[in-house]
Design a protein with these regions (language model features):
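Iron-associated oxidoreductase/ferritin-like identity signal
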Residues: 1-76
Length: 76
């Protein structure tokens, strides 16, 4: 079983990764609107990568008997 302190640290990082994912996605929307499709595509990929990080940590936490939780994500 994973300790409560470590579980909290993992969950805080999961939330941070998802916040970053949302930030990159918002940047992609803005770039695409301005006609910067190449940069927008790159930001979309960055968003996906951050989400993958969050999922990997959540899967690790659950596999070790912890609970993965996402805290409130502030508006980007």
């Amino acid at each position: 079983m994973i300790s409560e302190n470590l579980q909290k640290a993992f969950n805080d990082q999961i939330t941070a990764e998802l916040w970053s994912s949302n930030l990159y996605l918002q940047m992609a929307f803005t770039l695409r609107k301005e006609g910067w499709d190449g940069f927008a595509h790159w930001m979309e990929k960055q968003s996906e990568e951050e989400k993958e990080h969050a999922l990997a940590m959540a899967h690790y936490l659950i596999k070790r008997g912890g609970s993965a939780k996402v805290s409130t994500i502030d508006v980007v």
